[in-house]
């Protein structure tokens, strides 16, 4: 018998174009380190106003316990020179995960994070009042219920999760962050039309009459609200989006028969995203639009000889005047 070893590593890169410049992201992933099923991942992001690096270690069966052990390190610098401030954060996260009932998983975690917000003379007075050094120690947990028929391109089933993180002891600003989400999949017509509906709701509040620090504020990412930059929607201070205390999004998607040859091994889908980011606790004068944002578009995923390719084109249907659009997004990956 001849057994061919399958590749367990991958390299991926992504490029985005938006009204605020370009975005480049690259990652290296090894799914079977030392032949023990250990997952190692390193990711770097470079944008006009952001530099971020992440490294994670995940052992799915730590010491034969059937429990997952995950350790991650992260560092990020947000540099908004035109608005006169820079925010740095550095931290680590420890987590474990195990199944408590059939299809129900529990994931407790703890995070230690250090933040440093520096301002210059061009910063607004409100941003200057947010400056300082902050240490945060939080504990959190996640419950998830997963009945999807597949984790890769599912055609039926539901994924539900409830995530909460509490920062109290040894934290300069005590906060509570809650995220609830659900995604359901269903065959709409034969195998060509697979529909999905994704809902996400998030909230963050501070205690002891304090305000949520900038790095804990909520932003909509490109999978929540396509067509906009990851930091391009929500409350604005001195022409910069500062994130909100609340987020709500709804994403509807459906595949359809491929207009490209089958030899390209492609999936195409249409989508409609609706949502908003709102709420500012540290000032009532911040520009905070209640307008519901919505976008529609088309996406194409191709499995090519050089790895998976993803193209997304989005058109905003409704937006606020302060929003930053990102109409086109391209990603490329490879395996080794």
What is each of the regions a protein language model found here?
Residues 1, 28, 57, 182, ...:
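Hydrophobic, well-ordered secondary-structure elements that form the walls
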Residues 168-176, 280-287:
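Short glycine/threonine-rich loop-to-helix capping motif typified by GTGT followed
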Residues 58, 146-150, 167, 183-187, ...:
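Short beta-turn/strand-loop junction motif enriched in small, turn-promoting residues
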Residues 191-271, 277-279:
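Extracytoplasmic gating/loop element in the C-terminal half of outer-membrane beta-barrel translocons
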Residues 160-167, 173-204:
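Acidic, glycine-rich loop-and-beta core segments that form the ion-binding/anion-interacting portion
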Residues 279, 284-310, 315-321:
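C-terminal structured "cap/appendage" subdomains that terminate the fold
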Residues 9-11, 276-280:
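Small/polar (Gly/Ser/Thr/Ala-rich) solvent-exposed segments
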Residues 2-161, 175, 193-195, 221-238, ...:
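Gram-negative/organellar outer-membrane beta-barrel architecture
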């Amino acid at each position: 018998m001849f057994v061919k070893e399958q590749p367990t590593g991958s390299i991926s890169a992504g490029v985005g174009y938006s009204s605020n410049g370009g975005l480049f992201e690259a990652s290296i992933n090894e799914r079977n380190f030392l032949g023990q099923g250990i997952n190692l991942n390193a990711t770097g992001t470079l944008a006009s106003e952001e530099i971020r690096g992440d490294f994670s270690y995940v052992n799915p069966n730590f010491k034969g316990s059937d429990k997952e052990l995950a350790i991650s390190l992260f560092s990020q610098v947000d540099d908004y020179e035109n608005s006169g401030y820079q925010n740095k954060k550095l931290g680590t996260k420890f987590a474990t995960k195990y199944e408590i009932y059939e299809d129900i998983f529990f994931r407790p975690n703890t995070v230690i994070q250090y933040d440093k917000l520096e301002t210059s003379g061009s910063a607004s007075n409100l941003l200057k009042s947010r400056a300082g050094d902050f240490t945060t120690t939080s504990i959190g947990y996640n419950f998830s219920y997963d009945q999807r028929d597949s984790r890769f391109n599912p055609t039926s089933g539901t994924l539900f999760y409830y995530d909460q993180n509490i920062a109290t002891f040894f934290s300069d600003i005590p906060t509570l962050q809650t995220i609830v989400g659900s995604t359901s999949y269903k065959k709409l017509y034969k195998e060509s039309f697979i529909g999905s509906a994704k809902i996400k709701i998030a909230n963050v509040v501070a205690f002891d009459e304090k305000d949520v620090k900038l790095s804990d504020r909520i932003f909509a990412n490109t999978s929540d609200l396509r067509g906009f930059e990851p930091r391009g929607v929500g409350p604005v201070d001195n022409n910069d989006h500062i994130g909100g205390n609340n987020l709500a999004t709804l994403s509807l998607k459906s595949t359809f028969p491929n207009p490209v040859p089958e030899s390209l091994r492609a999936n195409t889908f249409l989508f409609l995203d609706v949502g908003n980011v709102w709420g500012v606790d540290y000032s009532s004068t911040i520009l905070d639009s209640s307008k519901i944002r919505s976008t529609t578009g088309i996406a194409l995923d191709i499995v090519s000889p050089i790895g998976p390719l993803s193209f997304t084109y989005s058109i905003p249907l409704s937006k606020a005047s302060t929003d930053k659009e990102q109409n086109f997004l391209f990603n490329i990956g490879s395996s080794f």
